[in-house]
Amino acid sequence: GNVDPRMLTNSTKSDFRQMLTYLRDAGAKEIGEYFPNIPFDDPLNLNVFRQIEEFGFPLTFHIAPAIGGCYGVFDELGLPRLERVLREFPRLIFLAHSQPFWAEISRDVTEEGRRGYPTGPVTPGRAVELMRRYPNLHGDLSARSGYNALTRDPEFGYAFLEEFQDRLYFGTDIANVPQDLPQVPYFRKLKVERLISPEAFEKITWRNAARLLGLPQETAR
């Protein structure tokens, strides 16, 4: 399910509980992809986050590097606004997604680089720092952004998957059967060549999602 903080009265007093109740009763398990193109910590967003946290939904966000000309919640280099909301809503699970988040896996990210898919060795950056500091920050490994973050420095990628194996999720980004999905052969290689532990593989490819969405572990596969 999804909501936009500018709906209803376009104010910080908008009550989304009826909408969230409808989504929950209709079977929705998560909110997102959340991408209104306003600052991440805009009071309109904070109002929605507070209510989503109250309902217990996790939320997948898309970060934008600017306001205007793109979609996504806006944050600057270094992700200060994301940190604020992580701190303010400790019971709300945020699933990170998009280039401006995953580019921050390395400390040497630039303003230009966060708009695309940086290459080269990784020196652990803000994305890693925030995941270590805030247990409510999880990682959506879908799309080229998540894949690039894992594969630009293979050895770092394996270590990252192991360290955060309880908070990372295989994903497809969109429902498009014929799409090219490099994550599939990548994870098959991880399993066959034992590049990560069997436990990490199971968690990231399906167990974490089953747990997050409240699905029975024995029937989720």
Label every model-predicted segment.
Residues 1-47, 51-55:
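Mid-domain alpha/beta scaffold segments of enzyme catalytic cores
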Residues 2, 97, 142, 206-207:
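Conserved beta-strand termini and adjacent loop/short-helix elements that scaffold enzyme active sites
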Residues 13-21, 154-156, 216-220:
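Short, surface-exposed amphipathic charged segments that create phosphate/polyanion-binding patches used
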Residues 14-21, 25-28, 66-84, 183-196, ...:
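Ligand-binding grooves and catalytic loops that recognize ribose/phosphate and carbohydrate rings
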Residues 23, 52, 139, 173, ...:
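Conserved, mostly hydrophobic/aromatic
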Residues 29-30, 42-170, 178:
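Catalytic pocket-lining loop regions of alpha/beta-barrel enzymes
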Residues 36, 65, 204:
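Residue-level "edge-of-site" marker
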Residues 164-169, 175-221:
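Mid-to-C-terminal alpha-helical segments outside catalytic/metal-binding sites
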